[in-house]
Amino acid sequence: MNLHEDKFAFLNIINLVHEDSGIRSDILEKDYYVTLLLRELAGKQAELPAYFKGGTALYKAQKSIRRFSEDIDLTVCIDNCSNNQAKKRLELATKKYQSLPRTSRKELEDDRKGSITAVYDYAPLVGIDSDDPLQRFGYVKVEGTSFTVSEPFTPLEIEPILYTYATEEQRQILQAQYDVGPFRINTIRLERIFADKIFAAEFYYERKMYFDVAKHLYDVSVMLDLEQIQKMIGNQQMFLEMLGYKRLEETRRTGSDLAEKKFSDFQLLGGFGDNAALRKDYQNMQRNYVFSEEDVLPFDYVVEQWKKLREILLTLA
């Protein structure tokens, strides 16, 4: 992928796709750079057991940007590694990319046992909204964790959104001249991501971190209707297996009580429709992350989706 090296062509295709699709130019540009780093990771995965996961993986799987998720989340397997080997593997998954320069703003980065966040800068060609409250453009954040359970994973075909929405003629040029197109990357399975998000929503809800809760509420509401998730729900053994991976992971998370917590005791599943603070943060989240009117999910709809989920979870053995 070298489209970004031809600044005129890069800006031109961003503008053309923006005009045809309505997707914001700054999002098309950042998504390209997110995908650039993922392409580099995909080339390492034969030797490096680091797997793409989370909200960005969810929407990359859908080849859409229903809710813009701008960071790269990775789970890094360190089974049978010494402490030194584990640290080096985590660093390789987060700190060693060559496609973009590491940031000089070290306050954006974090390095602790079992978790590293590295940040890579890019120079935006499109106009940046200086009023963007999250200030999320001009860099890509890569977060890798090794206390997580890195399974099950599967190869997933992904591509930059500007390729997804390009015309056939534009796609041919992107592939032939700039090596931009679909590729496969080992990714945590969507069924596992779904299970993770149920627990993540409860984790943040316990702590009244409602803006973070809101993102997971939205994602789970989207995923609940996916054919792949509906098939899992119909297969209780498989659903329990996915939930089990996450419960195992929670035994390794400091301060979490979710490894043994029954679904009947989940605060979130007790109902949140009358939580005014959560409703406010949910609406704020959508203003900042959901940019197409057709992708906006009313809070009351999300409440109903989670009521359906509650009934499903309470019937599990």
Where are these regions (language model features)?
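Glycine-rich beta-strand-to-loop/alpha-helix junction loops that act as flexible
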Residues: 52-56
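Structured mid-to-C-terminal alpha-helical surface segments
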Residues: 1-50, 62-66, 76-317
